Every structure is written in structure tokens, then in C-alpha cells.
């Protein structure tokens, strides 16, 4: 039934809004909807073919009704596709502003572990979304570069504690802080200034200890 697949895609988008992470791209649903639109467009062309450019809706209301239904189905499918991609785009842009490397977290371009050597982990992003994130991140970096003294992607709320205890969840190498350099190795703990590690916490490298 026309519109049923598009409805599933909208439900997927609604669930995505409530999730803290981005689920895998619904490539099968998207392709099915695109094929449906093309089928409808072919039906419209086939219906209008005998009339040429002289179709009069008032003279043939049944044909006009069929054309209207097909047209509305195509429009609805398009709107559902746009809504789905808008939800995912807004989430991706939000990750960029929060300093979260979504490409790394989704395993894009990385080899799997545990007997999966030589195979790449499946990314939750489509190839187009991965390219969008790269270009958006480049634009954001260029925009932030104009104000080097201000972290435009930082939290708008001041930290409650100036210094915090953190545990390293994964190796992050050496970082420079206001009080010198520290090497972040997995499972190590540090008492550091909140502002120096805020971005690393958001990226999942560190865990704040209560």
C-alpha cells in the first residue's frame, strides 16, 4: 500500500529523536520509498500519455482523481524522506558542536576486532552522511578559528566544580593542560581542571567520577 513504507520511516525518525545515539541509517526503507515515487511517476506519465498536452480535468474527473492521488502520494513520500533526513542531520550537527567524533564512534573506516580482522565495522551512517559530517566539521573548525580565545562549542553552564576526578576509558595520549602535560592511559585516574578535560568527557575518552 502506497505510503506505508514512508510511515515506517517517520516512526523511525520519531524514535531517533528520543535516543541518545544515532541508529543505523534506514537504507532499505529509503530505497523502497524512492522506488515507489518512481513507480508513481511512471503511472502518471502512462495515464497522461494518451492525452498529450490537452488533458481537461473537468472532462474526465475519474482520471483527474487518479492523477491527484498519485501526486499526493509522491508529495507525502518526499516530505517523509525530508523529515527523516532532517532529524538525522540535526543530530549529526549536534554531535559536531558537542565535540563528539561520531565517525570514530560508529566505526567508520576502522577494522573490527575479535576475529574480524580485515573486515570493516559497519557504520551507522550512510556514505553521504559521513561526507556531510566531515564537511560540516571543517566548516565549524573554520568558524571557531576566528575566535581562538573562546570555545564556541563549550557548555553554556559554568562548571560546579573547578577540579574533578576522572577515569580514562580509552587511551588518548598526551594532552596539554594549564598545569602541564598528562598522559591519558586506559584505567588511569586523574584529578584535573574540569575545563581541560570537558571535551574529552563528551567524546567518551574520560568518565567523571562522583
From Swiss-Prot:
Report whether Cytoplasm shows up as a keyword of the record.
no
* Gene Ontology cellular component annotations, sorted alphabetically: GINS complex
Q: Where in the cell is it found?
A: Nucleus
Q: InterPro entries, from UniProt?
A: GINS_A (IPR021151), GINS_bundle-like_dom_sf (IPR036224), GINS_Psf1 (IPR005339), PSF1_C (IPR056783)
What is one GO biological process annotated to this record? DNA strand elongation involved in mitotic DNA replication
What are the entry keywords? DNA replication, Nucleus
Q: Nucleus among the record's keywords? A: yes
Q: Where is the composition biased (Basic and acidic residues)?
A: 110-123
Disordered: region residues: 108-129
- What is the residue range of the signal peptide feature? none
Q: Superkingdom, according to UniProt? A: Eukaryota
Q: Which Pfam families match?
A: PSF1_C, Sld5
Q: What does this protein do?
A: The GINS complex plays an essential role in the initiation of DNA replication.
Question: What family, per the record?
Answer: Belongs to the GINS1/PSF1 family.
The record describes its quaternary structure and partners as: Component of the GINS complex which is a heterotetramer of SLD5, PSF1, PSF2 and PSF3.
* Protein name (database record): DNA replication complex GINS protein PSF1
User: What species is this protein from?
Assistant: Phaeosphaeria nodorum (strain SN15 / ATCC MYA-4574 / FGSC 10173)
What lineage does the source organism belong to? Eukaryota, Fungi, Dikarya, Ascomycota, Pezizomycotina
